[in-house]
């Protein structure tokens, strides 16, 4: 869960949320920076696959910041494939002082455009309803990126249509 520092990570409302929802929001930037630095320095790593949830709750600001970090990986020569999930859209909020406030969210419909440079643009098969996709990650090797979230079914569920698509 990448959380942009501007969505807040302190105050009474934040502390209350953390009692039941521990996502390391305050530390996520440093964690991503450290992990990506290690991946960049690892000359054997050619392909990086990052399954969602990519952001805390789909805050557009968090997606934009995370994408900047992904470009650093890509510029180092790594091939990157992400798969979005349920926390990447809807239910966006932030913390300011001691309050939980609304934050600009990311519509489900634009996620694949945001992450086009990180797998979705290379899809050889794509399920528009769930954003699941197939991509050839290297010669002769295909990745099936399954997202079991959509606007038309409960988050975290796969229906018969989705299973048939995956086959």
Where are these regions (language model features)?
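N-terminal active-site segment of His-dependent metallophosphoesterases
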Residues: 1-60
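A generic secondary-structure signal
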Residues: 34-42, 68-72, 165
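Extended active-site neighborhood of metal-dependent phosphoesterases/phosphodiesterases
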Residues: 60, 65-164
